Amino acid sequence: ECYHRARLYALRRQRWMCLGDLDSFERAESLGVHVLCLDLSIPFTAARARNEGANYLIQNKPNLDYIQFVDGDCIIYSDWPKKANDFMNGNIDYAIVCGRRRERYPENSIYNQLCDIEWDTSVGDALACGGDALIRVSAFQQVDGYDEGLIAGEEPEMCFRLRIKKWKIRRIDADMTLHDAAIVRFGQWWNRAKRAGYAYASSCYLHGLTVEVFKLKDVLSIVFWATCIPLLIALLAVYNPIFVVLLLVYPLQVLKVAWLNRHKKLGFRVTLFHAASIVIAKWPQFLGVVKFGFNTLFGRSGRLIEYK
């Protein structure tokens, strides 16, 4: 078998919790995993779970150099830890190294396949990592870990703060983890996109006015395609219905995105689905942006946006 289950310091919430995923914590303990229980009087976020697990490790292993973070629905490839450690040992200016995450069952649905395409990021220096990554403890401590107030997008936000401190992030050409998105319905995909919009908005709120204008472009793109264009077309159509033809800008955008991604050689059908998903996602993402806006305006804490 090409992978093994990593020994993780995981977290419990009611039942077993590993960064927000419910499972049997008794089974985890039987496998030799240490289970760390969260204080449920404090609102749960994956960022808080990661921080508490990391801090427990650091306190009990003071000489620890690196921590491998893994999402609860992932399995680590057996040769990944050595490859990641070798890279970090030889590159002291890097805070994070990550590899290729793959979908375990891409054939089960087009949505799983879209996730697998999303995981296929470019090899080389990166702006951010995902939930699976080997992180240097000294760098993690320098930025005080993840922002526990974020309900999504905590990894790119922490990576932004690391880069401000002159740390680097690297994506190496190596298989890292297998992930089970388990997305088989359109509604699941919709909620996942909505969560992404919420993440963009919350990160932009924190750092959008910095030199990098962090995530501002993403938020503006969402607002432009989901609201500005439809409103403009609707207003013009009041004067002359012929302006409805401007709605063709959306299928044209799908074709443009498909053309720009032709080098991925996904096949005609998957390429079109992938391009269409990027364009259609602007609407659920906009709902995520709006939800963040209302939560911020009325001083409400954000709730996790689950998709499975």
PLM region spans:
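Glycine-rich, basic loop-to-helix element that forms the pyrophosphate-binding segment
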Residues: 3-5, 40-59
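Acidic donor-binding segment of Leloir-type glycosyltransferases
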Residues: 5-41
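Short, acidic/glycine-rich phosphate-metal binding loop used to engage nucleotide
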Residues: 38-46, 124, 148-149
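Short beta-strand-to-loop acidic/aromatic patch adjacent to the donor-nucleotide binding site
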Residues: 61-75
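Conserved donor NDP-sugar-binding/catalytic core segment of glycosyltransferases
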Residues: 75-110
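A recurrent flexible, glycine/aromatic-enriched loop bordering the glycosyltransferase active site
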Residues: 102-104, 118-135, 151, 157
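Catalytic donor/gating beta->alpha subdomain of glycosyltransferases that bind UDP-sugars
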Residues: 149-150, 156-212
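Membrane-embedded multi-pass helical conduit in multi-pass membrane proteins
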Residues: 224-296
